């Protein structure tokens, strides 16, 4: 699930090599589309939220899924001491959201409810978040603007469809 523009350990080497050229799949929404009893997103930067979701999932019968963002010093190209900060920053800049899905299984009809657990009043800088990691070193200003526009479109959908 490599984000747009990120280089990985398997990205071809060379001056002209660029990171991932596609948007990553939203596994949380794919899982929710299958009507599971419970799905959530979490970040190790917001441990209280993560622990609440683990407790919630523990009490639900059936398949449960929690998609956790947990930075990797080697893969992300940042010091180990910054991992929790990065896990918080990705939420605060709006590139990762904290949410839950609770499915309803009545009469064979699947459906469910999405809940946004944290909405930053104002997003922090996407540019600062991306530039703090070696994996995004090659992103141009235009590509960073594309990431920001993609984030804004995603949040418009969340606010429209999950409210």
Regions found by a protein language model. Name each.
Residues 1-64, 80:
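Thiamine diphosphate
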Residues 30-31, 60, 66-69, 144-147, ...:
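Weak global preference for isoleucine
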Residues 12-18, 67-70, 92-97:
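Short, surface-exposed, polar/charged, turn-prone segments marking secondary-structure boundaries
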Residues 46, 69-74:
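Glycine-rich beta-alpha junction loops
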Residues 72-163:
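Flexible, low-complexity linker and terminal segments
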């Amino acid at each position: 699930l490599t984000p747009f523009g990120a280089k990985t350990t398997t990205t071809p080497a060379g001056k002209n090599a660029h990171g991932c050229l596609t948007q990553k799949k939203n596994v949380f929404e794919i899982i929710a589309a299958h009507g599971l009893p419970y799905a959530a997103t979490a970040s190790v930067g917001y441990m209280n939220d993560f622990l609440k979701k683990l407790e919630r999932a523990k009490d639900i019968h059936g398949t449960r899924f929690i998609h956790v963002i947990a930075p990797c010093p080697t893969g992300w190209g940042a010091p180990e001491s910054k991992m929790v900060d990065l896990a918080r920053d990705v939420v605060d800049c709006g590139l990762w959201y904290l949410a839950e899905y609770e499915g309803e299984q009545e009469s064979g009809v699947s459906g469910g409810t999405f809940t946004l657990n944290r909405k930053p009043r104002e997003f922090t800088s996407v540019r600062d978040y991306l530039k703090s990691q070696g994996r995004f070193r090659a992103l141009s200003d235009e590509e960073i603007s594309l990431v920001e526009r993609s984030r804004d479109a995603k949040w418009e959908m969340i606010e429209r469809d999950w409210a």
